């Protein structure tokens, strides 16, 4: 269809004004607006036959300096090369994502009097859109139309992409409608660009509907279109729609490729539809679509996460039989699974196999190996693996050190953990919240309360963020070592802060107060709780009341506990039974024992010991011991 350039220009300008843009920016200085002067350089050293490079070796231009040198050769040539040859270079640089350089070279062409053509302007529009400078892209479009060039479908598709990435999806939809009105026929690329934009702006239903509209307009979606829709749906968790689209493709006799199957399989795995993922994998093979390493990695990782390491191992064997080489991701998933299953020998063998296959373990691999050894208290082997990692020029990261430090601290080798912390600092790594919290806990577990407090002060001094876990460990440690006053200062600070306190912290403080004999203060805190108490909270408070022989209050709290829907456990019953026995209330004790047994619990060592002693003293008969056992 013949189109009027002036009519096209008029309609596009109307489109801008309708969107509240006003007139596009003035054009003469639009190259300068992007700040591209930094790419200017002297071309005095440029040499070589640019024609031969443009004709046969343009794909060799992979570095910025090479592109600039070639441009230098071209502008030194007299007469100047044709605009077609300049466009080839600009297009190659744009594919390198060096959009700023493209604009800079365009500016220098303009300075030298080298006229741009439609294709040149289209390249500039694409570059400005990719840099999210939509107003400048519109300025170029306005200039090219004033010069008599009419935008083609590629130019307008670039502009469409700019709208989509500038959070102006309604403008993008309007532009496609205007393109149709002006006689342009949007192609598959145009529609796919808009579909991608719709997904970017959470308009999934519109994106899916657009696929049907494409067909109605005589534009057949291709694999890229379907892949875009499948990817968008899977990212949203709309897996059923993605599977339906797969069926629709089959009905339209469009064969899905491995990328589309991989996208759906990976999504099924992430959303825990393991069996469906395995079935789709089988269907994929039946249809003659060869799975690749990405397919296997998704399934192997998924199976490992669900503890199905034997199935994952079978998939690895299947993979090797088909001559599909596993990569570091494959081995990492399996190594992690074997360690979690306690299969240390198998995990080590996988590491050895990686090396035999010339697959370099990465930081994640070594972190998994080190963590696996630490999990099973094989610290010397963990340290040895750490040294091996460093010897292979694989730099340990903060997670590596945190894993080792945690391993040593758990085994009460806190000094070794501190030594690793020093080594980490020497390597230029800064300890994070996990690092400091782990060392604080390590010192408390080793019985060194002062050092734990010192590390906390250092943490605050170094402005390392503290979290709820840090304070939980700190308060528990302080209360355990009788430092209630210090714990109370920190607790009051937390109450005034914006940090959301959990029940563990409240339980810690209530227990600390009760152990210090401050049962009244503990009761006040219990009554002021803003979150629901759990069984530990009730047990701690009941134990505190019993320690002060406030048995009626303890019994009332026991009843309230059950009314609030918190089920008593063995600790609840045994605490109350012992308190009533010490108070010589045999009837209440007997009633509690019956209730405890009917709930499936038995007397613990402390209760049986107390009953046995009271039997020897003649204060109880054997019926109590029989009830307990």
Swiss-Prot record:
InterPro entries, from UniProt?
A: Pentatricopeptide_rpt, TPR-like_helical_dom_sf
Q: Which UniProt keywords apply?
A: Repeat
Q: Does the keyword Manganese apply?
A: no
Name any one Pfam family assigned in the record.
PPR_1
Its domain of life reads Eukaryota
Q: Where are the PPR repeats?
A: 46-81, 82-116, 117-151, 152-186, 187-221, 222-256, 257-291, 292-326, 327-361, 362-396, 397-431, 432-466, 467-501, 502-532, 534-568, 569-603
* NCBIfam families per UniProt: PPR (TIGR00756)
Into which family does the record put it? Belongs to the PPR family. P subfamily.
Kindly provide the name given to this protein in its UniProt entry: Pentatricopeptide repeat-containing protein At1g63150
Q: Which organism is it from?
A: Arabidopsis thaliana (Mouse-ear cress)
